[in-house]
Amino acid sequence: IFDSRAPGFVSGAICDKNTLNACFLGLPHWACQPEQSVNYVSCHDDYTLFDRLALVNPDAPRQTLIRQNRLAAAFVFLSQGVPFLQAGEEILRTKPKGRGKFDDNSYRSPDRVNAIRWDTLESPEYQETLAYYKGLIAFRKAHEGLRQTGREAVQASVFPVETGNPKAVCYRVEDR
């Protein structure tokens, strides 16, 4: 059951390694092939990624939320399957309702909630986050091992590495 206020791995919660492994490996228990797995951390049907991180970590400094956003993006782009982003995720999009609340179902909300704030894009935090996303996309494109198209190829090229740290996830990916 999805709980938008429950912290996940990106927010510092200790999560089941088998679940994390399955995500990185293209959900082999659910999808026959990795390209049948669509990887995302936010979509139009719920909070934006940044809003969810802020809800889960209400006292976290903005820079912590930005780092968590980038970690979530790394999960999306470094996992087997099809990456999917909500519009504006790469520029820390938020849908504020006012009084510290965020809109989780904004299809009837006005433009002031749904609009992408293009005037903020010159800010260094937005530029740095956008550059980070672009770097992840380029990295994924450059390494075929991150874009396997068959279950056997994933099994032959992606290997979880045990770190002994419950808050660390590590993989070795080989381009073949």
Which residues are covered by each model-predicted region?
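Residues that flank catalytic or metal-binding motifs in active/ligand-binding sites
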Residues: 36-37, 112, 132, 167
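Catalytic cores of secreted or luminal carbohydrate-active enzymes
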Residues: 117-151
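Charged, low-complexity, helix-prone segments enriched in Lys/Glu/Asp/Gln
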Residues: 62-71, 113, 133, 137-140
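Extended hydrophobic/aromatic segments used for targeting, binding, or gating
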Residues: 91-131
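Short, well-ordered beta-strand micro-motif
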Residues: 117, 170-172
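Conserved alpha/beta catalytic core and glycan-binding cleft of carbohydrate-active enzymes
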Residues: 1-92, 96-97, 107, 144, ...
